Curated annotation (Swiss-Prot):
Entry function: Catalyzes the GTP-dependent ribosomal translocation step during translation elongation. During this step, the ribosome changes from the pre-translocational (PRE) to the post-translocational (POST) state as the newly formed A-site-bound peptidyl-tRNA and P-site-bound deacylated tRNA move to the P and E sites, respectively. Catalyzes the coordinated movement of the two tRNA molecules, the mRNA and conformational changes in the ribosome.
Domain tr-type G: from-to ranges: 8-283
Keyword Zinc-finger recorded: no
InterPro entries for this protein: EFG_II, EFG_III, EFG_III/V, EFG_IV, EFG_V, EFG_V-like, EFTu-like_2, G_TR_CS
Entry protein name: Elongation factor G
Protein's organism: Oleidesulfovibrio alaskensis (strain ATCC BAA-1058 / DSM 17464 / G20) (Desulfovibrio alaskensis)
Biological process according to GO: ribosome disassembly
SMART domains: EFG_C, EFG_IV
GO CC aspect terms: cytoplasm
Superkingdom as given in the UniProt entry: Bacteria
Length: 693
């Protein structure tokens, strides 16, 4: 099967930003101008094409990463619209993992907001080249140049302003392109679909000259040959400037910055031009490298070519009411056909792909074939999980999976009736498979089912989906904080597990050294020499330790950030077994945890409050009362902006409190920042209440 679009003519991009910066509106305009959508959908009317779940249309926010395809200037653009709400950070994470480039949308009034920083760091981690779109230039308080400064200062990026805005706020009417020297003035009557191209307006000529010189100098710094030409007094051609910007963008040494107002239909076509001009195709980025599942040391390069063996990543699972299981797949090398059998390198199982679909938000186009660089949805893969690699059985390869964030909040859930019990279990299992940042677990002490997620909104949506999609009614308890335990000093434990009860006994002897491993999770080191413990028993010790750490010694919360070294031990020729060493490891680490001064940890949130000046003192006093630590204060468009760290346990009900305190005029956003030790007096209370004293 031949491909319709050459790989260099393909762009896989994400639209990412803080909530309310205008991501979905920007995507809607892109679909309108590329001819995919004949009517513009508005998020505030609940009509946006990309927001297709009922909850999204009701709440006017994007929850899942809708994927869609459009064409612009002979290029196919696959767009993934990601949520800006921190509770859905896994959706951003899995989108960035499979994208080649991204458009970061900023609010021209607010600039770089907390979630913008989080998403930017996620994109850095996955080495995703970006361009920036400063949106809402028509709003009161809009300031393009302040946004550019914030991108430099807060995100530590090198912004390349490619445009000069013509006017701002109500007077915003277009842009001047610093590369071509042409002004684009948008026609409000045609909803921005028509525009006039003119020369640089006289009142902007001086500013244009200064900014163009700054752009050329910045671009020349990225390229020795251009720097030589520039220093020699020669004029750089438009083509040379475009090529240098493209190289710098793909190398992630600079980020082009454009501006507009998506809602007023201004600046979207130049943004599309920039996507095609500056963001990479699948062949412009580093080749994907996987590992041999049988030997992780052996690296396997997966070149982006159709004729290479298949290597593809399942990055999202979803349920469609009419089709059933959908697996969203990014193909890195090779091709997939409807009806072909593929091999899951993570599970070692073979599966058959039933149908292949190109997705347009919630509409589908059936296709027979998809090649390297494509993003498609497959029907029929029943055994896959998010992060699995599918490949050919004669060339198995495992690609790097996703970083799954740990939940910070949990609630107890129970079926309203006995008849709902089985249906609830099945529905929760299905939802947990779709969304890896959502966890379901049983609490043995209370016999309750607990669901855990990234925030209250995340769990609200889950409960909502239980009713709407699965017709399951459930009662939900009050939100609980997901506390953790850790140790605060080093210790060494010598533990012998020996059991004799007629016949073959049990014998396992381990000596472990335990120390804190701050913010680095669990680490196991095997330091056994001379075969004092046979190597086939070592994994059992590790597993025993890991399972024991799931329930800490203070209050039964999971134990984190612990480094364990197995340094010595002994075994018995007859009585030793994997089970005996599993128990020895488990008991040894419990003893070590008790000796190593265990402490409780709580999730601390990064909170940003935007409040009118007259309520500042009241808001600050309240945050201090919630154990908040002020990080910074700033003024923005006539309001005060407070950034602070506050324990999650102190933030329940804050939205209602803040509303009444400021007559509804202040707002806040928060996201998980780090875990911190709980103060001794509170830790004692928590431990007592957990143990039922």
């Amino acid at each position: 099967m031949s491909r319709k679009v050459a790989i260099p003519q393909q762009r896989n991009i994400g639209i990412m930003a803080h909530i309310d910066a205008g991501k979905t509106t920007t995507t809607e305009r892109i679909l309108f101008y590329t001819g995919v959508s004949h009517k513009i959908g508005e998020t505030h009317e609940g009509q946006a094409t990309m927001d297709w779940m009922e909850q999204e249309q009701e709440r006017g926010i994007t929850i899942t990463s809708a994927a869609t395809t459009c064409f612009w200037k002979d290029c196919r653009i696959n767009i993934i619209d990601t949520p800006g709400h921190v509770d859905f950070t896994i959706e951003v994470e899995r989108a960035l993992r499979v994208l080649d480039g991204a458009v970061a949308v900023f609010d021209a009034v607010a600039g770089v907001e907390p979630q913008s920083e989080t998403v930017w760091r996620q994109a850095d981690r996955y080495k995703v080249p970006r361009i920036c779109f400063v949106n809402k230039m028509d709003r009161m308080g809009a300031n393009f140049f302040r946004c550019v400064d914030m991108i430099r200062d807060r995100l530590k990026a090198k912004p390349l302003a490619l445009q000069v805005p013509i006017g701002s706020e109500d007077e915003f009417q277009g842009i001047v392109d610093l590369v071509t020297g042409k002004a684009v003035v948008f026609d409000k009557a045609s909803k921005g679909a028509e525009f006039a191209v003119t020369g640089v307006p006289a009142e902007l000529q001086d500013q244009f000259d200064v900014m163009r010189l700054e752009l050329i100098e910045a671009v020349a710094e990225e390229d020795d040959a251009l720097m030589e030409k520039y220093l020699g007094g020669e004029e750089l051609t438009e083509e040379e400037i475009h090529s240098a910007i493209r190289r710098a963008t793909i190398a992630r040494t600079a980020v082009p910055v454009l501006c507009g107002s998506a809602f007023r239909n201004m600046g979207v076509q130049p943004l599309l031009d920039a996507v095609v001009e500056y963001l990479p195709s699948p062949v412009d980025i580093e080749q994907m490298v996987g590992a041999n599942p049988d030997n992780e040391e052996e690296k396997i390069v997966c070149p982006c070519k159709d004729e290479e063996p298949l290597a593809a990543l399942v990055f999202k699972l979803a349920s469609d009411p009419y089709i059933g299981h959908l697996s969203f797949i990014r193909i890195y090398s090779g091709f997939i056909e409807a009806g072909m059998t593929v091999y899951n390198a993570n599970t070692g199982k073979k599966e058959r792909i039933g149908r292949l679909l190109k997705m347009h938000a919630n509409k589908r186009e059936e296709i027979k074939w998809a090649g390297a660089g494509d993003i498609v949805a497959a029907v029929g893969l029943k055994q896959v999980s998010t992060g699995d690699t599918i490949c050919e059985i004669n060339r198995p390869v495992v690609l790097e999976s996703l970083d799954i964030p740990e939940p910070v909040i949990e609630v107890a859930i129970e079926p309203k009736t006995k008849a709902d019990r089985d249906a609830l279990s099945a529905a929760l299992a299905k939802l947990a498979k779709e969304d890896p940042s959502f966890r379901v677990k049983g609490d043995d002490e209370t016999n309750q089912t607990l669901i855990a997620g990234m925030g209250e909104l995340h769990l609200d949506i889950i409960v909502d989906r239980l009713t709407r999609e699965f017709s399951v009614n459930a009662n939900v308890g009050k939100p609980q904080v997901a506390y953790r335990e850790t140790i605060s000093k080093e210790t060494k434990v010598d533990h012998k597990y020996a059991k004799q009860s007629g016949g073959r006994g049990q014998y396992g002897h381990v000596v472990i050294e335990v120390e804190p491993n701050p913010e680095k999770g669990y680490l196991f080191e095997n330091k056994i020499t001379g075969g004092v413990i046979p190597k086939e028993y070592i994994p059992a010790v590790d597993k025993g330790i890991q399972d024991a750490l799931k329930s800490g010694v203070l209050a039964g919360y999971p134990m984190v950030d612990v480094k364990v070294a197995l340094v010595f031990g002994s075994y018995h020729e007859v009585d030793s077994s994997e089970q005996a060493f599993y128990v020895a490891g488990s008991m040894a680490v419990k003893e070590a945890a008790r000796k190593a001064s265990p402490v409780l940890l709580e999730p601390v949130m990064d909170v940003e409050v935007v409040t009118p000046e007259e309520y500042l003192g009241d808001v600050m006093g309240d945050l201090n009362g919630r154990r908040g630590k002020i990080q910074s204060m700033d003024s923005r468009a006539g309001a005060q902006v407070i950034r602070c760290h506050v324990p999650l346990s102190e933030m329940f009900g804050y939205a209602t409190d803040l509303r009444s305190r400021t007559q509804g005029r202040a707002n806040f956003t928060m996201q998980f920042d780090h875990y911190e030790r709980v103060p001794a007096n509170l830790a004692e209370e928590l431990t007592k209440s957990k143990s039922g004293e």
